[in-house]
Curated annotation (Swiss-Prot):
NCBIfam families: RNasePH. Phosphorolytic 3'-5' exoribonuclease that plays an important role in tRNA 3'-end maturation. Removes nucleotide residues following the 3'-CCA terminus of tRNAs; can also add nucleotides to the ends of RNA molecules by using nucleoside diphosphates as substrates, but this may not be physiologically important. Probably plays a role in initiation of 16S rRNA degradation (leading to ribosome degradation) during starvation. Gene3D superfamilies: GHMP Kinase, N-terminal domain. Pfam families: RNase_PH, RNase_PH_C. CDD domains: RNase_PH_bact (cd11362). InterPro entries: ExoRNase_PH_dom1, ExoRNase_PH_dom2, ExoRNase_PH_dom2_sf, PNPase/RNase_PH_dom_sf, Ribosomal_Su5_D2-typ_SF, RNase_PH, RNase_PH_bac-type, RNase_PH_CS. It comes from Mannheimia succiniciproducens (strain KCTC 0769BP / MBEL55E). The gene is rph. Homohexameric ring arranged as a trimer of dimers. Keywords: Nucleotidyltransferase, RNA-binding, rRNA processing, Transferase, tRNA processing, tRNA-binding. GO terms for molecular function: 3'-5'-RNA exonuclease activity; tRNA binding; tRNA nucleotidyltransferase activity. This is Ribonuclease PH. Its EC number is 2.7.7.56. It comes from the Bacteria. One of its GO terms (biological process) is rRNA processing.
Length: 240
């Protein structure tokens, strides 16, 4: 029996609140059950040095967790003086995922930075961050089109992400912390709205998984992402 009696292919309740802060060009509070992440999009009329003069833009991301977003307080990375390997891995994943949804040439020579700050963690913080940041990025780019900065939208479609895994011998979708900590296999899948995959990260924490189990997990991820896309579309269609 899963927590909250969820079906094996059922994500946690997803809530996406747009325009959550007033200063950023795009801002979202995304909630996957008890995991909550604030995602903001900042537009700047400049690009990294390696892209100057090349006529294309850039999308990047930063990720962090508040000290008491977890069960016990952890030190701020700023207090340690450096980012941890996990943080750098996650923010690179977020950035790669979001760049896949944007035509960088059509964006022009400007940068958009997505800041993903976890305020409460209960598993799946990276997948929630990608899902929420996608909506914040969409709002920021739509604003550029509406104010005439961009003539056409560089958006290629939505991006969503979900965790899947094998827990107690059963393949399940969208693991919360108690499931994630007990999983024999843990996988994160990032998908485009058209069904193409951007990234698959899978690890056997216990027993190795079979090819058949891999296909089962990917199928679960597709079902989960389709439900997440529905939540994103509903949020973007809502009047705020």
């Amino acid at each position: 029996m899963r927590p909250n009696n969820r079906a094996v292919n059922e994500p946690r309740p997803i809530k996406i609140t747009r325009h959550y802060t007033k200063h950023a060009e795009g801002s979202v509070l995304v909630e996957f059950g008890d995991t909550k992440v604030i995602c903001t999009a900042t537009v700047e009329d400049s690009v990294p040095r390696f892209l100057k003069g090349q006529g294309q833009g850039w999308v990047t991301a930063e990720y962090g967790m508040l000290p008491r977003s977890t069960h016990s307080r952890m030190l701020r990375e700023a207090a340690k003086g450096k980012q941890g390997g996990r943080t750098m891995e996650i923010q690179r994943l977020i950035a790669r995922s979001l760049r896949a949804m944007v035509d960088l040439t059509a964006l022009g020579e400007r940068s958009i930075t997505l800041d993903c700050d976890v305020i409460q963690a209960d598993g799946g913080t990276r997948t929630a961050s990608i899902t929420g940041a996608c909506v914040a990025l969409t709002d920021a780019i739509n604003a550029l089109v509406e104010n005439g900065t961009l003539k056409t939208s560089p958006l290629k479609g939505l991006v969503a992400a979900v965790s899947v895994g094998i827990v107690n011998g059963e393949a399940v979708c969208d693991l919360e912390y108690v499931e994630d900590s007990a999983a024999e296999t843990d996988m994160n899948v990032v998908m485009m709205e058209d069904g193409r995959m951007i990234e698959v990260q899978g690890t056997a924490e216990g027993e190795p998984f079979s090819h058949e189990e891999l296909l089962t997990l990917l199928n679960l991820a597709k079902q989960g992402c389709n439900m997440i896309f529905d939540a994103q579309r509903r949020a973007l269609a809502a009047d705020c």
